[in-house]
């Protein structure tokens, strides 16, 4: 498989997508934050001094999706048409994060979905670190993507979780 972010001399470049067709593209990413059970209970009950952790993480993730090209060097700036973050509380101490990003464009939104989940997780960590420095952010991964020349990708464990 060819790495397209390098030219013939091995120098970095942003891929030219001008000849690609505009299609609807959707990407779903997931990750999780593991914490002490007491921390999760304080998030659930609104007992975190910095505010509503999941509401702030949701906004942070959406904002991050829109800014992905500013932090990932070879990412194209995209006019995202939709971004959504979902959180699932899994006792005793896990928050699972799902990010779904959509665009009609010439390149996919995988990096935007991954960035949304990553920043949402980092926001949860930031807002709770005063009471729990043992939190672990993990398993950030692309679950599914549709649209574009490379077609439909679906991670096997995502297929199992949606059936």
From Swiss-Prot:
Xref: SUPFAM superfamilies: Molybdenum cofactor biosynthesis protein C, MoaC
Recorded catalytic activity of this chain's protein: (8S)-3',8-cyclo-7,8-dihydroguanosine 5'-triphosphate = cyclic pyranopterin phosphate + diphosphate
Single GO BP term: Mo-molybdopterin cofactor biosynthetic process
Keyword Lyase: yes
Keywords tagged on the record: Lyase, Molybdenum cofactor biosynthesis
Pathway: Cofactor biosynthesis; molybdopterin biosynthesis
EC number(s) recorded for this UniProt protein: 4.6.1.17
Residues of the active site: 126
InterPro entries: MoaC, MoaC_bact/euk, MoaC_sf, MoCo_biosynth_MoaA/MoaC, Mopterin_CF_biosynth-C_dom
Recorded GO MF terms: cyclic pyranopterin monophosphate synthase activity
Binding positions (substrate): 74-76, 111-112
Domain of life: Bacteria
NCBIfam families for this protein: moaC (TIGR00581), PRK09364.1 (NF006870)
Family the entry assigns: Belongs to the MoaC family.
Subunit structure: Homohexamer; trimer of dimers.
Function: Catalyzes the conversion of (8S)-3',8-cyclo-7,8-dihydroguanosine 5'-triphosphate to cyclic pyranopterin monophosphate (cPMP).
Name the record gives this protein: Cyclic pyranopterin monophosphate synthase
Organism encoding this protein: Desulfitobacterium hafniense (strain DSM 10664 / DCB-2)
């Amino acid at each position: 498989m060819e790495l397209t972010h390098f030219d013939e001399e091995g120098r970095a470049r942003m891929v030219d997508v001008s000849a690609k067709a505009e299609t609807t593209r959707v990407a779903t990413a997931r990750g999780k934050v593991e914490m002490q059970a007491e921390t999760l209970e304080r998030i659930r009950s609104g007992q975190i001094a910095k505010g509503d952790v999941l509401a702030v993480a949701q906004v942070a993730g959406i904002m991050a999706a829109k800014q992905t090209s500013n932090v990932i060097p070879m990412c194209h700036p995209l006019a995202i048409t939709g971004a959504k973050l979902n959180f699932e509380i899994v006792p005793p101490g896990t928050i699972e994060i799902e990010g779904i990003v959509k665009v009609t464009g010439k390149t996919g939104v995988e990096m935007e979905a991954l960035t949304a989940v990553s920043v949402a997780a980092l926001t949860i960590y930031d807002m709770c670190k005063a009471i729990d420095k043992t939190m672990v952010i993990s398993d950030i991964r692309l679950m599914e993507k549709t649209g574009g020349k490379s077609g439909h990708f679906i991670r096997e464990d995502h297929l199992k979780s949606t059936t």
